Structures are given as structure tokens and as C-alpha cells.
């Protein structure tokens, strides 16, 4: 395990200049936070497996970072980069044009972005045998990173620590959260673990697939014939999962997506009110002339690595960080990450969420109204399957309306919460809730972390 702090006390007015000019400043610099405090490094989590993390200290004008929570953000895919997409496209201090983000979560929490699993973003492996193959391996790697992080950053050991996530990142967050709880109980990791937040998360893949047809039909994006076609392949996915044929289920999942694209004129799986690019539909028609896994990866990781973001990460950001190996590029191993998780992809983790709830860990589920790939109907379906004894009381509650702007009468979300389970329905948002509804996402984060 290797971890060394990378920081340099540079006057803030100088910090943005080299990056905006696309120049190499020479020394590692700490922009763009108000306090100008960032650290980043690699941790060797296994032989030939190196995980990259990037920490921003909170920049609240009224509170010290030690008075605010620490949020770790996990991206989806698997193979999507937290330090890239989550940081510059969703919740970090700057957007992908390097302009300040008004809704950055940094104003209410310190942010820890981790490129996970190994091979994602700036994380990398040396040798094909070092990729993670399943959730257990992903969680084990993260325990090595978190043990190292909290040992070296003792100032965060007592700060409330939350794991926020998106998409497949939610599945990883559940598994990581449970292993972290166990590690804390054993005394091998010292931190103040406060909860997990599962955003549009791949907790029960088959429940998502089964809900696609009814959801699209209710939104006038399928008619009777199309609904029948989608429902037929969804049943095939269910049968494969029930038989434990998870590789086959993953392939059938890809087939279901192709049928949906053909019947909806290329609906966008991440926001049904926006259109997929024409190349997306064209590529889907060619899917089974290539490896179905490679095609699925192109569809579900490509949007997290668009050209502009890739150029930013492999250009100015790489120069800023100064520790990326010369033979590694941001996102260069993403396809291999996705392919190596094939067997694990369609496995549900409802039982893990149950274990978290039974352990008293705060669990928040939040979902965008316009998401298709992990639609709200599917999320509600797996929540109803929880064996948590308090679920009936949770279900009987009436939800409460939320407003991102207290001066507005427009409803931004609904929430239902009982004991250590909460569910947020985020309106007018797709799969990437912070990107679509930044104000409401920030408000939700504050509510989850008990700041409102």
C-alpha cells in the first residue's frame, strides 16, 4: 500500500492560469477550491492493481471542513470514472469547461472521488489477470484503499462518511458499505461510517428490465406490439437469472435494449425526453456482429467518456496531476473493466441492502423520473422485496413534496423516510440526477447528510 500526499500552497489567483492556458505549471497545484486544498494519489490494492483517488476539502465559508461530512462518489459502468464524469460533469467544483459549478457538493461536504474498479479512469492494472471479476473483489480492493486513506488522513476519521453512487456504482456502494461496516466492527478501519446513497442504482437488474416495457408504454414510447416484444425478451432475462445463468442474462439484457431502440426510434436510456445520437441506433443494429459485451460497454460507458471530457482528462488534468504513468491513459482500460465483470453484472444485491438496513446503516435510494435504464418503477419493485422488518411501516407512509427553490411552487421531488431507509423521487431528472437537477441533488445531499 502506497500513499503520499500531493499538495502545494499556491496563491489562488495563480492556480487557474496554467490550466486555462493549457500549460504545464511544473509543480502540482491545488486549484480550484476556495481553500485551494486538494490531494490525490494511487494506492496499490493488489499485485499489479493500482487505484487512483482524488480528494477535495470542503469549501464552506462558514464551516471548517472538519464540521462537514466526507462524501465518496462512485460512478457506474462498471468502468465509468468518478474523478472524470462524477467530478467534472456532476458534483465537482468545476464543470468540463473549467467553469465554477454553482451546485457543487463541495460547499456542503468534502469530496472523495475514486476510480473504481481498478482499470477505471486513471486507475490501472498491469496484466489482464488483475481486473476485478465480481463485487466481492471490488469491495475487497476498496477496503485496502479506505484503510490506507483513513490511516493517512486521520482528520477524517471522526467526520461522518457517506458513500454516494450512481448506476452500477450503487451496486458497488452496497457491497462496499457492508464490507466497510464489518471492517469497522473488526477494528481494521477507523472511520465514522454514516450511510450509503444509491442513485439510479443497479441493485436488482431483472426488476429494472421487467419494468422497461410498462414504463415506456405509460410514456407513449411503446404501443401494443412493441410492448409485447419487449415483455417477451424481459421474460427471457428473468428465466436466465432464475436459473443462475448470469452470462446469458447479460447477453439477453443487451438484446432487450436493442429491441427497445428499434421500437422507440432510439429512445435515450438515460433520459427519455432526449434523443440518442443517430450513431447509437446504427451501432445497435450491428451489435451481434461484434462481441455483445464490447457493444454493451460502448453504449453504457461511452456516454461517461465523451470526447471533450476525455481530452480534458488526458490533457490539462493529466498535466496537473503529474503522477499518471506514461503508458496509461484516462479510460484506456474501461472496456476491459466492463468485460471482466460480465458474470457479476446481472446478479441482484437486494440481500446486501437488507443486511445494511439490519445493521442500522442509513440507506437512501434516489431516482430520476426520466431515467429508463434504471427506471423508478424497477427501483420500487426491488424495495418491495426487502425483508427488513420495518418495511411495512415505511410503505404505509405518505410521501412529502420537496422544493429546490423555497420561493417556487414547482415541486422538485418527493421523499419518504422511516428510520434508516429513505426514498427520493427526483422530478425532471434522468439517470444522472446531479447533471439534470443540480439544485435538487444538492438539497437532497444536505438532507441525507443531516444538514437540513
Swiss-Prot record:
A GO-annotated cellular component: extracellular exosome
Superkingdom: Eukaryota
EC code: 3.4.16.-
Keyword Secreted part of the UniProt annotation: yes
Keywords: Carboxypeptidase, Glycoprotein, Hydrolase, Protease, Secreted, Signal
Molecular-function annotations in GO: serine-type carboxypeptidase activity
Residues the record marks as carrying a glycan: 64, 126, 362
Signal peptide start-end: 1-26
Localization per record: Secreted
UniProt KW Hydrolase keyword: yes
Residues at the catalytic site: 167, 371, 431
First-listed, main subcellular location of the protein, grouped into a coarse class: secreted
Pfam families registered for this protein in UniProt: Peptidase_S10
Any Gene Ontology biological process: blood vessel diameter maintenance
Function, in words: May be involved in vascular wall and kidney homeostasis.
Similarity annotation: Belongs to the peptidase S10 family.
Protein name: Retinoid-inducible serine carboxypeptidase
Amino acid at each position: 500500500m502506497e500513499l503520499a500526499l500531493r499538495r502545494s500552497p499556491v496563491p489562488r489567483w495563480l492556480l487557474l492560469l496554467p490550466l486555462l492556458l493549457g500549460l504545464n505549471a511544473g509543480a502540482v497545484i491545488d486549484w480550484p477550491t476556495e481553500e485551494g486544498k486538494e490531494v490525490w494519489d494511487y494506492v496499490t490494492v493488489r499485485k499489479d492493481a493500482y487505484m487512483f483517488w482524488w480528494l477535495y476539502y470542503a469549501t464552506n465559508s462558514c464551516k471548517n471542513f472538519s464540521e462537514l461530512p466526507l462524501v465518496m462518489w462512485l460512478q457506474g459502468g462498471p468502468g465509468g470514472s468518478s474523478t472524470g464524469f462524477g467530478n467534472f460533469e456532476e458534483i465537482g467544483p468545476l464543470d468540463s469547461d473549467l467553469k465554477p459549478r454553482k451546485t457543487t457538493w463541495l460547499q456542503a461536504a468534502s469530496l472523495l472521488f475514486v476510480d473504481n474498479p481498478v482499470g477505471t479512469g486513471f486507475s490501472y492494472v498491469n496484466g489482464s489477470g488483475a481486473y476485478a471479476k465480481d463485487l466481492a473483489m471490488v469491495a475487497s480492493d476498496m477496503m485496502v484503499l479506505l484503510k490506507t486513506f483513513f490511516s493517512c488522513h486521520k482528520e477524517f476519521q471522526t467526520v461522518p462518511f457517506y458513500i454516494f453512487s450512481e448506476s452500477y456504482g450503487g451496486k458497488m456502494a452496497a457491497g462496499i458499505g457492508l464490507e466497510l461496516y464489518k471492517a469497522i466492527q473488526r477494528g481494521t478501519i477507523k472511520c465514522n461510517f454514516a450511510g450509503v446513497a444509491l442513485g439510479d442504482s443497479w441493485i436488482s437488474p431483472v426488476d429494472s428490465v421487467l419494468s422497461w416495457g410498462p414504463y415506456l408504454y405509460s410514456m407513449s414510447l411503446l404501443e401494443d406490439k412493441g410492448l409485447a416484444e419487449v415483455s417477451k425478451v424481459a421474460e427471457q432475462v428473468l428465466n436466465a437469472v432464475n436459473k443462475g445463468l448470469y452470462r446469458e442474462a447479460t447477453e439477453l439484457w443487451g438484446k432487450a435494449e436493442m429491441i427497445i431502440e428499434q421500437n422507440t426510434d432510439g429512445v435515450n436510456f438515460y433520459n427519455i425526453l432526449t434523443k440518442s445520437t443517430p450513431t447509437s441506433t446504427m451501432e445497435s443494429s450491428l451489435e451481434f456482429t461484434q462481441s455483445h459485451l464490447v457493444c454493451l460497454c460502448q453504449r453504457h460507458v461511452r456516454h461517461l467518456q465523451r470526447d471533450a471530457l476525455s481530452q480534458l482528462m488526458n490533457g490539462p488534468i493529466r498535466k496537473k496531476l503529474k503522477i499518471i504513468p506514461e503508458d496509461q491513459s484516462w479510460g484506456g482500460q474501461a472496456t476491459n473493466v466492463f468485460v471482466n465483470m460480465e458474470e457479476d453484472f446481472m446478479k441482484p444485491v437486494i440481500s446486501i441492502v437488507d443486511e445494511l438496513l439490519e445493521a442500522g446503516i442509513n440507506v437512501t435510494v434516489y431516482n430520476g423520473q426520466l431515467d429508463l435504464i434504471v427506471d423508478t418503477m424497477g427501483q420500487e419493485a426491488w424495495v418491495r422485496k426487502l425483508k427488513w422488518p420495518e418495511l411495512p411501516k415505511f410503505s404505509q407512509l405518505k410521501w412529502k413534496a420537496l422544493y429546490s427553490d423555497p420561493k417556487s411552487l414547482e415541486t422538485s421531488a418527493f421523499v419518504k423516510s422511516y428510520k434508516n431507509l429513505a426514498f427520493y423521487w427526483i422530478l425532471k431528472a434522468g439517470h444522472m440526477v446531479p447533471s439534470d437537477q443540480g439544485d435538487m441533488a444538492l438539497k437532497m445531499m444536505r438532507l441525507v447528510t443531516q444538514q437540513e
